[in-house]
Each structure stands twice: as structure tokens, then as C-alpha cells.
């Protein structure tokens, strides 16, 4: 009877809190939701820029070793590491769904168990991806790369195995901490790591002349240092409510986590590989050198803006999953609206900035007049890419928060690879629009995908989503009173 009374009291408290929230004016609601959004988005954006900075610093130091080394680095990271990164980051997205909804439902003891289950699943995935790096030489030769570049890339690929394994604790700890809006710590340590990486790269490459060995050693330190700090923070008191120690329960109910991880991996890697396909298609066009240089500049600019959008993807997935887990359908819908509006507002500003600047911004990256002219010609497409990318990742974040990854994977496959790429091939090769035609086709694929996700979001029954989320939470939950490090005989 006492337990029943406790449940009733908790329900009344929740209801009273909701009623107070409903009585707030629209300005106050927007302000409160925006603060919750930026608490996750700002550190997520900063972390992505710091991680991107580590790669850029390494590229700069390796570039001074020679053009062959630079080409090998670019191929290794653009083709091999992006391939595995897309899969593992996508698979970690499942943890964002599970932890976010469990945290919203106040089932705090489950977050640590979900984290450990994701470590098991992603470690298995990383081991399965190892042959890609071990046999990098034959793979790159089969893709038509020059043998002299492949010889260096083969060495780099073995170093990258260590970076690939760092993604397991890195991505999972990020999702675990983001679900609790505690990801500030990640931004602090990645900033320090970037500064140390610059110093160690100079020391090992420029001062001691250790070449590729020095550059990759510094990079490994830069990737693993933040992870060590995050793991210490999680396991040594920074998350007392959600980390209850290592548990044998991590080995139970792995199948639902694996299924959701595979759906998440399919959803995100199909998005991340899309730009790689654009580069491959452009490389086969006539007079591709100038086009590739211009496209590389445009993609670099687009990637910088994309980090803002990916920050909002992380934030809205947390907000939606938290609200669904807490049984608040209105809150999930409102969080979606605020995230889309905020990201779209930033996208509109950047859209007009790049339309106005056109080719002038290219002189930051090149001194070639031909390349600058090509960038100016591509600037309208770059501006539209930035505009679309301010909405599409946010809607993908809503999908992660709600657990729709499997559906969105099919949407991405159809829109990108059955619509966007074929249209790009026709416009680029048949109609003769060259790189512009390929990009228009790819943009059309993104536009169709954005429209489909928008319709899916608008037609969502949020009350039904709450019921589905709570049903899943109750199915997998471990009672808090139970010893988390034991599995009872009846199980």
C-alpha cells in the first residue's frame, strides 16, 4: 500500500509540474527550452571543432613531409577511417536513444548498464572492421590508387587501428554524458587535448624529425587523453546516480541493443558516405583537377557548418528522448520545434553570407584564379547545401531520440542512393553539367530526404511515441533495489 501511495504521489508531483509548465508564457517556454538545448548543443559543437582541429593539425604537419605522405594521409582518413567512423558513430547513436529515454524516465541505474552493453557491441563491431585497415594496401590498389601512395597509406592504416578503437569509449561516453546534459567536461578535455597535440606534433615532427611516426603518435595521444579523463569522470564519482559500477547485467539483453545499433549505424553511415560518393563521381569527370580542388574547398566549408548542425542533432536527440522517457509528448514536440527553428535561423544567416561572399572566401584556401572562379560558380550550391543541412540533421536527431533509426535508414537509402546519385550522374555525365550537375543531383536527394523526414515528424503521434518509449523502458529495466552486480537464478 505504501508503494502504491508513493507512485500516486510521484504522479501528482509530475502532473503539478506539467501544469505549472503549461501556465508559463510562450516567451518563457522558448527561453527555458532554448537553454536546455544549448546546454547540450554548445559543448557538442565545440567538441566536434576540437576533434576536427586534431585532424587538421596532423594533416598540416604530414603535409610538410611531402606530397606523397599528404596524399596517403588524405586517402586513409577520407576513405578508410570515414568508413569505420560512420558505422561506429551511427551504432553509438543507439545508446543516445536508450540513455536519453531512461534518464527522462528517471531509471538512472539503467544508463550505466546500457553504456556497458554498448561497449560490448561496439568493440565487436570494431574488431570486425580491423581487416579494412590490415588489408588497406590491396583495398586501395583495387580502388585505383597509385602504388607509391598506397605504400605510405598502408603504414598509416596500421596506426589508424588505435584511433578506430578509441571511438568505442569516445562515442559511447559522449552519448552517456549527453543524455544527462553533462557533456561540458568533454569540451574542456578536447580543447586541452588539441593544444597538447599542436605542441607534441611540433616536438616530434618538426624538432625531432620523427616524421609519420611522430605525427601519428601525437594524434593517438590526442584521441586517447580525453577518453581517459571521461572514463575517470564517469566511473569515479562524476555520475553517481547513473554509474553503479561494472555489472554482469551488461551481458544480458544484448540483442535489442545490437538491433538498434545496427539500425543507427545504417542510418548515419549512409549520410556520412554521401559526400564521399560526390568526390568519387567528380574525380571521374573531364578536367577533374580544378573541379576537385574547388569541390574540396566547398566540402571543407560545408563540413565546418555541418558541425553546428551535428551539435543540434545531438542536442535534439537528447531533448526528445528525455521528454519521451518522462512521458511528456508536448515537451518532445516543442523541443523539436525549437531545435529546428534555431538551427534553421543559423542556416539562413550562413546561406546569405556565402551567397554574398561567393568566390572571395576561396582565397583562404588557394591562390589559383581558376580554382577561385570554380568556387564562385559553385557558391550558390554551397549556400543551398548549408541551408538544407541546417534542417536535415536536426530531423535525424529527432529520429534518434524517438528510436526511428531503422525507418530513417531506408529513407536515406532511397533518397540518397536511388534518387540523388542517379540524378547527379545524369546531370553531370549525360547532360554535361560536370561537377555542378553531380552536386545538383546530390542536393536533390538531400531535399527529398528532408521533405520525407519533415512529413514523418509532422504526422507523428507523440502520445503513441511516449507509450512506445515507456513500454521499451519497462521491458528492459532492472529494478533499482536489485543488486546490479548479480543475476538472480530465475534469470
Swiss-Prot record:
Subcellular compartments: Membrane
Chief subcellular location: membrane
Segments passing through the bilayer: 37-57, 75-95, 120-140, 156-176, 185-205, 214-234, 265-285, 296-316, 337-357, 381-401, 413-433, 438-458
Keywords, ordered alphabetically: Membrane, Transmembrane, Transmembrane helix, Transport
Membrane topology field: Multi-pass membrane protein
Family matches, as InterPro entries: MATE_euk, MATE_fam
GO biological process: xenobiotic detoxification by transmembrane export across the plasma membrane
GO molecular function, one term: xenobiotic transmembrane transporter activity
Signal sequence segment: none
GO cellular component: membrane
Xref: NCBIfam families: matE
Entry similarity comment: Belongs to the multi antimicrobial extrusion (MATE) (TC 2.A.66.1) family.
PANTHER family associated with the record: MULTIDRUG RESISTANCE PROTEIN
Protein name according to UniProt: Protein DETOXIFICATION 20
Organism: Arabidopsis thaliana (Mouse-ear cress)
Amino acid at each position: 500500500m505504501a508503494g502504491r501511495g508513493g507512485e500516486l504521489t510521484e504522479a501528482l508531483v509530475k502532473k503539478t509540474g506539467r501544469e505549472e509548465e503549461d501556465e508559463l508564457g510562450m516567451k518563457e517556454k522558448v527561453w527555458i527550452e532554448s537553454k536546455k538545448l544549448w546546454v547540450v548543443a554548445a559543448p557538442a559543437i565545440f567538441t566536434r571543432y576540437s576533434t576536427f582541429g586534431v585532424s587538421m593539425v596532423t594533416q598540416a604537419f604530414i603535409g610538410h613531409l611531402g606530397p606523397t605522405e599528404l596524399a596517403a594521409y588524405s586517402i586513409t582518413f577520407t576513405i578508410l577511417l570515414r568508413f569505420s567512423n560512420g558505422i561506429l558513430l551511427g551504432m553509438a547513436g543507439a545508446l543516445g536513444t536508450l540513455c536519453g529515454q531512461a534518464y527522462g524516465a528517471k531509471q538512472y541505474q539503467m544508463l550505466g548498464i546500457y553504456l556497458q552493453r554498448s561497449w560490448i557491441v561496439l568493440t565487436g563491431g570494431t574488431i570486425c572492421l580491423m581487416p579494412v585497415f590490415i588489408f588497406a594496401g590491396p583495398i586501395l590498389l583495387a580502388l585505383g590508387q597509385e602504388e607509391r601512395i598506397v605504400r605510405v597509406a598502408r603504414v598509416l592504416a596500421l596506426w589508424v587501428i588505435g584511433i578506430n578503437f578509441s571511438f568505442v569509449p569516445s562515442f559511447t561516453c559522449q552519448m552517456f554524458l549527453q543524455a544527462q546534459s553533462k557533456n561540458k567536461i568533454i569540451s574542456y578535455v578536447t580543447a586541452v587535448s588539441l593544444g597538447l597535440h599542436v605542441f607534441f606534433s611540433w616536438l616530434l615532427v618538426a624538432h625531432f624529425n620523427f616524421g609519420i611516426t611522430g605525427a601519428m603518435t601525437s594524434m593517438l595521444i590526442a584521441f586517447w587523453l580525453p577518453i581517459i579523463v571521461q572514463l575517470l569522470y564517469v566511473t569515479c564519482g562524476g555520475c553517481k546516480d547513473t554509474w553503479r559500477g561494472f555489472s554482469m547485467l551488461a551481458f544480458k539483453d544484448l540483442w535489442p541493443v545490437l538491433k538498434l545499433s545496427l539500425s543507427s549505424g545504417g542510418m548515419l553511415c549512409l549520410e556520412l558516405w554521401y559526400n564521399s560518393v560526390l568526390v568519387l563521381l567528380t574525380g571521374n569527370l573531364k578536367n577533374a583537377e580544378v573541379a576537385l580542388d574547388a569541390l574540396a574547398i566547398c566540402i571543407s566549408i560545408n563540413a565546418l557548418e555541418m558541425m553546428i548542425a551535428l551539435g543540434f542533432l545531438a542536442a535534439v536527440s537528447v531533448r526528445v528522448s528525455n521528454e519521451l522517457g518522462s512521458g511528456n509528448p508536448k515537451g518532445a514536440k516543442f523541443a523539436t520545434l525549437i531545435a529546428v527553428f534555431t538551427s534553421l535561423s543559423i542556416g539562413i544567416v550562413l546561406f546569405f553570407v556565402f551567397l554574398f561572399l561567393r568566390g572571395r572566401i576561396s582565397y583562404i584556401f588557394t591562390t589559383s584564379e581558376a580554382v577561385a572562379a570554380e568556387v564562385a560558380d559553385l557558391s550558390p550550391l554551397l549556400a543551398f547545401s548549408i541551408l538544407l543541412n541546417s534542417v536535415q540533421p536536426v530531423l535525424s536527431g529527432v529520429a534518434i531520440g524517438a528510436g526511428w533509426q531503422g525507418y530513417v535508414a531506408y529513407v536515406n537509402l532511397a533518397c540518397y542512393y536511388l534518387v540523388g546519385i542517379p540524378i547527379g550522374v545524369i546531370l553531370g555525365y549525360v547532360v554535361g553539367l560536370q561537377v555542378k550537375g553531380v552536386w545538383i543531383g546530390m542536393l536533390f536527394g538531400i531535399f527529398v530526404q528532408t521533405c520525407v523526414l519533415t512529413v514523418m515528424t509532422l504526422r507523428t503521434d507523440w502520445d503513441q511515441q511516449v507509450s512506445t518509449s515507456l513500454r521499451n523502458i519497462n521491458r528492459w529495466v532492472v529494478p533499482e533495489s536489485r543488486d546490479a552486480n548479480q543475476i538472480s537464478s530465475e534469470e
